[in-house]
């Protein structure tokens, strides 16, 4: 019986190595082709790919698959800048006549090309160094930065509609995103794969919840949390945020433990897609246009703060950013800002005259 079991395990291993879905090192030996480098990047235990969050890996996999399936057979040493431009144009082509160009698709592919070539450079592959030098001198049109944001008036309308729909959790979630200027992930958390037998915390069907706001983040009226992306600790005095405080005070005292935002149906933190689904349902009931997404609450927070005259560095710290340029990327230029600039310019002319 032991012999049979060992033989079964051996055959199982051979099957997995042969399988197209396996990422074992044996299947991912670098042979100079782009495909082999893509697969090595995904399989190598020392690859930076291993440090990515699961959701980011999924995004990367999309672009990597485009390269693997469409230009993977190309020898990296033979790829020129002209080839890369041609690939970009091909990836950008509409899916069907009359449909828009797929700029996001093309940009994702080129971004992943940069990633894997930089990985190859870290392995001191000369062909990757040459192609990397060429790529560093090339620019490609990406998706335009979002210009939408959520306003305070829309948040108020959303809160009202959420309570009418029996979803106080959604009223709380969006209010916290807007008032605190936090990423959605830092408010509602995210569910990460965790199949370990001794998984701790909140676990559901092989997924473990992490990174969301809990009551342990609040001491008195001060909310303090380390953000998931930058690791920067942000602090907010809820006494200065009446909307957020009002929503929190709706929570019964006996429920004030664990995650702040819980799905009324499951009693667990929201899955991302369920949260965004309910956001759209309630947003439509509140008269908020479909082009406004829940993630735009963060841009709304930054824009409102800068419009109100807050110092950019203060806004940067409140949003948990480590660079001012990141904060500026969330700022949606408004008429108030351009009017303020015009007033200052006109006033300066009077002083000169």
Walk through the language-model features, giving the residues of each.
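Short, aromatic/basic-rich helix-turn unit that serves as a nucleic-acid recognition element
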Residues: 1-5, 30-64
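A Lys/Arg-rich helix-loop hairpin that forms a DNA/phosphate-binding surface
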Residues: 22-36, 54-55, 68-90, 146, ...
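DNA breakage-rejoining catalytic core of tyrosine-based enzymes
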Residues: 77, 126-129, 139-160, 215, ...
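Basic, Lys/Arg- and aromatic-enriched nucleic-acid-binding interface segment
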Residues: 99-103, 107-111, 122, 130-189
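Conserved tyrosine-mediated DNA breakage-rejoining catalytic core shared by Y-recombinases
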Residues: 137, 189-247
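Catalytic-site neighborhood detector that most strongly recognizes the C-terminal catalytic loop/helix
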Residues: 149, 215-217, 229, 319-344
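Short, basic (Lys/Arg/His-rich) helix/loop patches that form interaction surfaces
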Residues: 164-167, 254-260, 265-268, 276-317, ...
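Short, polar N-cap/turn motifs at the start of nucleic acid-interacting alpha helices
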Residues: 193-202, 217, 290, 310-330
